[in-house]
Amino acid sequence: MKCPVLKAESERKRVSAEKNREYIEKLSKMINCKTVWTRSGENQTEYDRFYSLIPELFPNLAKTAKKLTFGGGCFVYVIEGKNATKNIMLMSHHDVVDGDDRWSTNPFEATEKDGYLYGRGTIDTKTPLFAELQACEELISEGYDFEGVNVYIGSSNNEEVCGDGMVLATEYFKKEGIRFDVVLDEGGAITEGQIPGVSCKSAVVAVHEKSRHTFRCKTQLDASGHGGFGGVSDNAVLRLAKFVAEVSQKTKSIFKGKFYPEVRATFERHAPYMSFPLNLLFGNISVFSPIIKKIMMGIPAASAMLSTGLTFTTISGGDARDPQMRAKTAEATMFLRCVREDDLYAGLEKIKAIGTKYGVTMEEIERDYCQPTDFNGEAFKKVEALLHENFPDVAVVPFLLTAGTDARRFTDVADNILRFAPIDLSKAQFATIHNPDERIGVINVGECVCFYKDFVKGF
């Protein structure tokens, strides 16, 4: 693959220092709200303070857009465009994980230091939310009429705990027959050092995330009996334990690794920015895939990109009120993350065969499937072009997200789902996500606003 010529970082699209200072002051107010979601709701005052900031910081948006709310605080602003035939969704979440005493600053008091803005949510994901809102605020004030497109800005209040915010929102969209041409959520970023041997920064745009499937595995005997009597070699707990052990032992042979298209593209499009011999290896995956796959399958983070992951998360059996009785029933919860459902269900047939041997039945109790987006399609190519325009110093590559986002909720109501925020992360910054000293480069905040303005105008 021909190596595109990258430019200097100084040629990025940016705002003036004065404008960027305004952005930092606004974002800091959002960071200072301790929007940590809890079931008991002890931070509701902080959430309310956060919600009151939105019309204060973005008055034109608040006056112009229609606001939808779902559940305990998930909100969606809707800007109706002129002659609109398309819908686009800019996503984020405003809940954050908590901080602790390992921070060098107060995690809920935005602090500027050494060219960075420290604070919980600066990366995950109050900066993207701020930039999305600010971009639309400015477009409205500039008289932009949003020709041909309705713009939705959605933000969940409980994404970090897999809450119901965006679940309720997508149920509403289904009911109203609203379908999105493209959804843009968190998940990818501008990174460096994440793939060994790459000589430049990369804008990694997730075109897919691994789906989630949960199964109840259960065994039941016709009769129990006292644990002191014979037959201890055949009870529900032992049967289930043998099933769990065998499935766990054979997982890698049941779900063999493969280079899925989006994973192959990640490495092939990075290859021009690698030196020998990595550029040769990853530029010719069809030739060297057996070698590369063998190496990657031995690295947990890498193997997650190539195969279905399986783990047993809960197990129970017998009657705790009468622990001397042999267990008549036992069950376990099996959790899987897959790249493609056909591979998942092919592997499940092998697991069911193991279950038959031990009298274990399986029932799917949750299916959370994600549909991959075509990285050769129009939506990805538009984002790719916007990134080359706004960040001409970075390579742009598709990738598979092995973590999770709220974007998966939109599988049934969106044609294209992309996971990317224009946060520029060094390797050290990347390590602060959900960890102490989360921070964003001060200059990067303005870059984010520029990107989202162009994204809205580009669609």
Model-predicted regions and their roles:
Residues M1-T122, E142-V149, T333:
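Acidic/His- and Gly-rich active-site-bordering loop/insert found
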Residues K66-L68, N83, E192, V198, ...:
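An extended, acidic, His-containing surface patch that forms the Zn2+-binding/catalytic region
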Residues G72, T105, G148, R179, ...:
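Short, solvent-exposed loop/turn segments at the edges of secondary structure
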Residues L117, I123-V204:
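Acidic/histidine-rich catalytic neighborhood of metal-dependent amide-processing enzymes
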Residues L168, H226-I254, L348:
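A short core secondary-structure module
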Residues E171-V182, L238, A245-E262, T266:
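Structural signature of cysteine-dependent C-C bond-forming condensing enzymes
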